[in-house]
Design a protein with these regions (language model features):
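Signal peptide-directed extracytoplasmic domains
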Residues: 1-164
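Bacterial extracytoplasmic/cell-wall-associated proteins, especially those involved in peptidoglycan
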Residues: 101-103, 117-283
């Protein structure tokens, strides 16, 4: 749209042609002649200079200024703050980012599965499976560019996770003989089960005790993770479903984290309560 001062918000899409950008600018009233803008872009090699995103532009800009403004860091890109709560699943996070016009859900899922992220905590054997990122999309408040590259949006979460994990945490994980994948898997179950911080360390202790005893964890939230629709309470039939995430039928940990835990759950995973209890009661 264009306001009374000739300013408009316009979106340059992901991997689109200069012709598409020219049409968007023309439709928004930013430029008068699509052909001239395309000619300028061709002569100045501007196609490689335009970054995808949503921009605040003015009818007062010439072609050179328009191209310069449609770049990351120009100050013209529209940003939005998004808060991700602890315990959100990857799918919930991606749906929220789509709702906030950051990236499309499909682009995010594709980037989650196929983009090469250089973090040692990710399971490289799961390349091609979006679930490899489950648990590592650290819940926090982020500022995103609207319409930014999906891989760049995801990298914000992963970099934040990387920065939150301290040397002390890594040392504790090593002492317990746990990979970061296992730590986050346990933390994700704690995140979904705990009603308050006081319960987290107890839940961690019970998980470890049951695993050591060869008992199924019987954690409802692992089954809820794979159900097609959300349920507040499982039925007996739900506990019989055929899934590696069914911790009523299988022993050990589920194959991946079931949510993205916060720091309190990760710390509880590494510092469980001193108890051999096999059960916990939730408030």
């Amino acid at each position: 749209y264009t306001d009374s001062e000739g300013n408009a918000k316009e979106r340059a899409g992901h991997q689109v042609s200069v012709g598409y950008v020219a049409k968007q600018l023309k439709d928004a009233g930013i430029i008068k002649y699509k052909g001239l803008f395309q000619l300028y872009c061709s002569v100045s090699h501007a196609k490689t200079k335009i970054d995808p995103g949503t921009y605040e532009l003015s009818t007062n800009y010439d072609y050179r200024a328009l191209v310069k403004k449609m770049q990351v860091g120009s100050g013209a890109m529209v940003t939005t703050k998004v808060t991700i709560p602890e315990g959100y699943t990857m799918e919930q996070i991606f749906r929220k980012l789509e709702d906030e016009n950051v990236c499309s859900y499909d682009d995010l899922m594709d980037a989650a599965a196929n983009y090469s992220y250089n973090y040692s905590f990710l399971d490289q054997s799961m390349q091609g499976d979006a679930k490899r990122l489950e648990g590592f999309l650290f819940p926090d408040t982020y500022e995103f560019y609207q319409g930014m590259q999906a891989s760049s949006a995801i990298n914000k979460f992963l970099e934040n996770f990387h920065n939150r994990i301290t040397a002390e945490m890594l040392e504790k994980a090593d002492e317990r003989g746990m990979s970061m994948q296992e730590v986050v898997t346990v933390a994700s179950m704690i995140e979904k089960e705990a009603a308050n911080d006081d319960e987290r360390a107890m839940i961690a202790a019970v998980i470890y005790t049951r695993i050591a005893a060869g008992m199924p964890l019987q954690i409802d939230s692992t089954i809820m993770y794979v159900l097609p629709e959300h349920k507040d309470v499982l039925t007996v039939e739900d506990t019989k479903i055929d899934s590696p995430y069914n911790t009523y039928q299988n022993t050990g940990l589920p194959p991946t984290p079931i949510a993205n835990p916060g720091l309190a759950s990760i710390k509880a995973t590494l510092s469980p309560a001193s108890t051999k209890a096999l059960y916990y009661a939730l408030d």
